Amino acid sequence: MSDALNKFSMPMFNDFVPEKIRPWIYLFIAMCFQLSGARYLGPLNEIIGDCGYMREDILMCMYCNLAGMAMWFPMLFRMKFRFSNKTLLTASSITVIVTNILTAHITFLPLLWLLCVIEGIAKIQGTFECMSNIQLWMTPKRDMKVFFPILHTVILSAICFQDILSSFFGHIGDWVLMHYLIIGLQCVVLAILTTCVHHFKFTNQPLLGVDWTGMLLWGALMAQLAFLLDYGNHYDWFNGSVIWYVSGFAVITLAMILWRMNNNRHPYISPRVFTSFRFVKPILVLIIIYEAVMGTEYVLEEVFLEECLDYDTWTNARLVWPVWVGNIAGCAVSFVWMRLVNRFTYVRLGILGTCFLGLYVVTMYFLVTPALNMEALWLPLFFRGAAYSCLSIMFMVSLHDSMDFQHFFQGLSIFNMLHMVIGGCIGCAFYTEGLNHYAAEAVRNFLITDSKTIMCLSVKTLYGWVAFVCAALLIGFMMFDSPIRRDRKMWRF
C-alpha cells in the first residue's frame, strides 16, 4: 500500500503527453506562477513617478501580496482534496490574469491592496498544486531535506528573474509591459491545461468546518500590522491620529482572533500550534529577528545604491545576478549539508547561514563610500543570497520536523506571516527611523552639509549596529550547539 502511494505518476495528463516531460511541464507552470505578482518592485521609481504613489504605497502592495500567500497555507490541502488539479490551476491562472490587468491600471489604493491579496492567494495555490504533484519525482521518499532546497531554488530564482525583467521593462520606458508578460505566460499555462490536462482527483472532501471568519481576521491583522510599520514614519508614529486608530483596530482584531482560537471548534489556526510543540516558539522568534536583519536589503542597500552611488533602476537590477548565484549556492549547500552529511545538524546550518549574513553586513560596512565600483558589491550580495536561502531552508525544515502533519500547514502560515511580512516590516521601520536619526545627528554634531556624505555615514552606522546583532546571533547559535549543552542530562524537577 505504501509503495503504491509513493510511486510517482501524473494521471491528470492526457495519454499523448510523454511521461518524461510531464513533471517538467508542471515545473514550468510553477515558475510562471512564481514570476507573477500584483505590483512589481523592480521599476519602483518609475511606478512612483507615473502613478504619484509614495514608496510606502508600493511596499504596502508587496506586503498585501505576501499576506495573501501566507494566510492561505491552511487552505491548500483543503482545496486540493475538494477540487481537481485542473480546476485549481485554471482558476489560479485566470485570477492572476485578471488581477494583473486590473492592477496595471487601478490607482485607488484600498482596491489595489485587495487585488494584491487575491493575487497572492492564486499564486500560492497554483504553485502548491504544481509542486505537490511532482514532489515524488523530486524525492521518492518525500524527504523534506531534498524537497525544500529544490523548492527554494525555484522560488528564489523566480523572485530574482521577476526583479530583473520588471526593471528591464521599466528601463526601456513602460513598467506595464511586465504585467503583459505575465498575462501572456498565464495564457500559455491555460493553453497547456486545456490541451494536455484533464480533470482528475483522488477524493472529494467538502469544505466543511473551515473558519472563514478566522482566516479574514488573520489577514486583517497582518494588513494592519504592515500598515503600522510601513506608514509609521510617514504619519509620525503615535504623534498622529492615524497610527492610534490603526493600532486600536489591530488590538481589537487580535482579541477576536484569540477568542475564536479558544472558543471555535475548528479555529483557522489552532492554539496547539503555539502550545504543543517545543521548538515552534523559538523558531518564530528567530525568524522575526533574522527577517528584521535582512530588511537591510529594502532600506540601507537601496539608499546606498540610489542616494550615495546614484545607480539607476537597470544598474540595480544587474546586481540581482550575484544575489541569484548566492541563492543557488545556498540551496546547494543546504541540500548537501542536510541530506548527504548526516552528522551536521540544523543548528550548524543556522550557524553557517548566520556566518554568510555576518559576512554580508561586515563587507557592506567597509564598502560604504560615495565612490565605489559596481563589481565590488558582487561578493557581499552573493553572501546575502546564500544567507537567505540557507536560513530559510533551515527554519522551514526545522519547523516541519517539530510539528505533526495535522498542524504543519497552520504553523507554516504563522511562520510565513512573520517570515514574509511582519519581520521585514519591523526591520524596514527600524532602519528608516535610524537613517533619520543619524542623518540629523550628522548635521547637528559634525556640521556636514553634503547629502551623500550624510547618507553614507548613516548607512555605515546602521550596518555597524546590524553587525553586532549578527555577532550576537552567531554566539547564541554556537552556545546552543556547544558540546557541554548537547551532552548534559536533562534537569528533573
Language-model-detected regions and their locations in the chain:
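Residue-level signature of mid-helix packing/kink "hotspots" within the transmembrane helices
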Residues: 38, 66-74, 159-160, 324-332
